[in-house]
């Protein structure tokens, strides 16, 4: 199942539902071109495509000359409270002309009412997702990650119970189409009983304000996120003692930058 989307509650539900029936999610960056999306659909021979409505036209073009049979379309409004959903639809009207093979998300969910929820037996070697490398050593490559990969990560963190407790919060600012975003930002916190705060499309300039608003004990990001926090004037003289574990990955962090961030955290 190829998924072209940012992180939304629907994409998280889809991850677990697909895994339970033995399917694999092929996660694709929604910023990719028609050609790029087409290549990744072909790579795994997807028969089902799931995409955001804002990238539907690109996905429709990309699905031509592939084995895609059905397209499930998500809207950012699907998870919003009614008043906010109406506001979103008024300010961002959906002008797509959908083909006959399209199923809207809510229609898809309604169609499953009363159906069997029997799951496949657990298979630790089942590939739950396919993500793609950055292409730094050539063309991007698909990487299959198993259920065991995801569960091993969660169990490693669970073993350190001095830091991680049920009921804490993790702010997920990472996209779903990188392994880091899904494994550390979704599966890990849910296994540990955390509340996950989803930021689907992060504006880096607002990161400090989001941290102050939600006060998450945990966050996973890249080094530049923490350098930005350390330099954010909105955080000056603020109490950030709620922070327990803010981790960086995905890129290198110079010794000087690491010291700057650590000094900032120690001072707050």
Predicted regions, residues:
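Conserved AMP-binding/adenylate-forming
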Residues: 1-32, 44, 173-175
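Conserved G/P- and acidic residue-centered "switch" motifs that form tight phosphate/ATP-binding loops
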Residues: 22, 135-136, 193
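Conserved adenylate-forming
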Residues: 34, 42, 54, 60-100, ...
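Structural detector for helix-capping/boundary residues
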Residues: 35, 47, 106, 125, ...
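Conserved pre-ATP/AMP-binding loop-to-beta segment of ANL
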Residues: 95-132, 139, 162-169
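Conserved AMP-binding A3 loop
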Residues: 128-152
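Conserved AMP-binding/adenylation subdomain of ANL enzymes
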Residues: 151-169, 177-218, 232
């Amino acid at each position: 199942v190829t998924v072209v989307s940012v992180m939304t509650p629907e994409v998280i539900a889809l991850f677990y539902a697909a895994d339970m029936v033995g399917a694999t999610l092929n996660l694709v960056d929604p910023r990719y071109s028609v050609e790029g999306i087409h290549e990744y659909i072909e790579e795994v021979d997807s028969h089902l495509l799931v995409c955001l409505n804002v990238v539907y036209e690109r996905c429709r073009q990309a699905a031509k000359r592939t084995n895609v049979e059905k397209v499930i379309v998500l809207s950012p409004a699907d998870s919003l409270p009614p008043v906010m959903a109406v506001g979103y639809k008024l300010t961002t009207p959906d002008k797509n002309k959908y083909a006959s093979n399209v199923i809207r998300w809510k229609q898809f969910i309604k169609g499953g009412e009363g159906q069997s929820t029997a799951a496949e037996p657990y298979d630790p070697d089942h590939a739950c997702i396919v993500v793609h490398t950055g292409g730094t050593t050539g063309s991007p490559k698909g990487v299959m990650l198993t259920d065991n990969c995801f569960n091993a990560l969660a169990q490693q963190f669970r073993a350190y119970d001095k830091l991680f407790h049920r009921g804490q919060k993790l702010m997920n600012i990472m996209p779903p189409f990188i392994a880091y975003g899904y494994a550390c930002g979704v599966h890990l916190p849910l296994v540990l009983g955390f509340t996950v705060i989803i930021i689907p499309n992060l504006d880096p300039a607002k990161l400090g304000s989001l941290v102050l608003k939600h006060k998450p004990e945990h966050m996973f990001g890249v080094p530049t996120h923490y350098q930005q926090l350390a330099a954010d004037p909105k955080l000056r003289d603020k109490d950030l003692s709620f922070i327990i574990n803010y981790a960086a990955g995905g890129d290198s962090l110079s010794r000087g930058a690491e010291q700057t961030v650590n000094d900032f955290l120690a001072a707050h």
